[in-house]
Curated annotation (Swiss-Prot):
Coiled coil: none annotated. Pfam families: ATP-cone, Zn_ribbon_NrdR. Binds 1 zinc ion. One of its GO terms (molecular function) is DNA binding. Keywords: ATP-binding, DNA-binding, Metal-binding, Nucleotide-binding, Repressor, Transcription, Transcription regulation, Zinc, Zinc-finger. A zinc finger (unnamed) spans 3-34. Residues 49-139 form the ATP-cone domain. Negatively regulates transcription of bacterial ribonucleotide reductase nrd genes and operons by binding to NrdR-boxes. GO terms for biological process: negative regulation of DNA-templated transcription. InterPro entries: ATP-cone_dom, NrdR-like_N, RNR_NrdR-like. The keyword Transcription regulation applies. Belongs to the NrdR family. It comes from Psychromonas ingrahamii (strain DSM 17664 / CCUG 51855 / 37). This is Transcriptional repressor NrdR.
């Protein structure tokens, strides 16, 4: 690894340890030329699968779209940003763990609904009403009844 101070190629690792619950390696390095020390972090780069939309189009996974949809459902609900971030990271890990290069947007929608069901029941109903395109109050009521029987 190149030294960020003098750009020398020859550096050595002084110390290594796992961080971020074992998902990263923190390395303390020293330059053999200028003797400066610096820290690097190493992690596996796992790409998100592409999405196959309902009309057949393919597009890259978009974190912003995911967060906008989730935040809209959770608007004015008592859920902390930390809980939202943890749930989104879990959802993204689940998608990466499929090992697939492409997944349908339907799978992502179902995962978001499960995520919201665990965070806030009202947010779940809000999201489900848009995602499932309820046609009338009866469908809305059926989803609420299903939610009540689950708990």
């Amino acid at each position: 690894m190149y030294c960020p101070f003098c750009n020398a190629q020859d550096t050595k690792v002084i110390d290594s340890r796992l961080v971020s619950e074992g998902s990263q390696v923190r390395r303390r390095r020293s330059c053999n030329e200028c003797n400066e020390r610096f820290t690097t972090y190493e992690f596996a780069e796992l790409l998100m699968p592409r999405l196959i939309k309902s009309d057949g189009r393919r597009e890259p996974f978009n974190d912003d779209k995911l967060l906008v949809g989730i935040n809209r459902a959770l608007e004015k609900r008592p859920v902390s940003l930390e809980d939202i971030d943890a749930a989104v990271n879990k959802l993204k890990s689940t998608l990466r763990a499929t090992g697939e290069r492409e997944v349908t947007s339907k799978i992502v929608g179902e995962l978001v609904m499960e995520l919201l069901k665990g965070l806030d029941k009202i947010a779940y109903i809000r999201f489900a009403s848009v995602y499932r395109s309820f046609k009338d109050v009866k469908e809305f009521g059926e989803e609420i009844a299903k939610l009540e029987t689950d708990f």
